[in-house]
Regions:
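Short acidic beta-strand-loop surface patches of small beta-rich interaction domains
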Residues: 219-228
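Extracytoplasmic
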Residues: 25-29, 54, 87-89, 188-190, ...
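N-terminal catalytic cores of peptidoglycan-degrading enzymes
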Residues: 1-86
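Primarily a LysM-type cell-wall glycan-binding module
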Residues: 186-210, 233
Length: 240
């Protein structure tokens, strides 16, 4: 089994009793979550300290960008409604808005990038991958230098990590991998598209992303409140 360590980015520690003891699988996944509230690391620590809550995460990022640790990386947290995932994933609860799309503040997202870089580096990984689909991600066997992103919504009827973060999972993977490789600028596959006559969000997603149902990612990425778009409007398109 791996030699485990914990992140030096954590400035607050309150270890939760809610965990399964040492992992049965080496770390090769990271699972970001949304808290559904602009909570502090102390609030998360208090929540996870209660045995009746039956929940915990390895780390949490408070609304101010501070990092808390609640379950050491060597141990499996109770976070993603799935034993197999949490045995191999470092789980991170992130302060968010209390309603859809559960947006993160800049301080939280930027710290998430930094924390993912640290987790990957300490666990010998040079690439963070977002494979997009549940089937592909859960059936993928990572190379020894690879870490895979997973999400709570694959294991429970939840939005988690929220539409805001879900639309940015590819960006997160690219930014982390770029920092791990020492690149000055993170590689991004995000592009733009100018709306034409007859377009709809569904049609654009089907044509550019290969799946019309991914229109929600375009909607979230552009901060659209409705499905209405206008000819000439420039839309940001997420990575394919």
């Amino acid at each position: 089994m791996s030699n485990y360590s914990n992140s030096s980015l954590a400035s607050y520690t309150k270890l939760s009793p809610n965990h399964s003891g040492q992992r049965t699988h080496a770390i090769d996944r990271i699972t970001p979550h949304c808290v559904v509230g602009q909570a502090s690391v102390e609030t998360l620590g208090n929540i996870f300290s209660k045995t009746a809550k039956q929940a915990s995460s390895n780390y949490g990022i408070g609304a101010d960008g501070r990092v808390g640790m609640y379950v050491e990386e060597k141990n499996r947290s109770w976070c993603s409604s799935n034993n197999a995932n949490d045995q191999r994933a470092v789980t991170i609860e992130c302060a968010s808005d209390a309603s859809e799309p559960y947006a993160f503040r800049d301080a939280v997202y930027n710290k998430l990038v930094e924390l993912c870089v640290d987790i990957c580096r300490r666990n010998g990984k040079t690439k963070l991958l977002w494979l997009r689909t549940k089937t592909k991600s859960l059936n993928y066997s990572p190379a020894s230098n690879e870490m895979v992103l997973t999400v709570h919504r694959w294991f429970a009827r939840k939005s988690c990590p929220g539409s805001w973060m879900y639309a940015r999972m590819g960006e997160l993977a690219n930014q982390v991998t770029a920092k791990l490789s020492g690149s000055a600028e993170p590689k991004t596959e995000q592009t733009t598209y100018t709306v034409k006559t007859g377009d709809s969000l569904w049609k654009i997603a089907a044509r550019l992303l290969g799946n019309g149902s991914r229109y929600t990612e375009i909607k979230t990425l552009n901060g659209l409140k409705t499905n209405t778009i206008r000819v000439g409007q420039v839309l940001k398109i997420p990575a394919k």
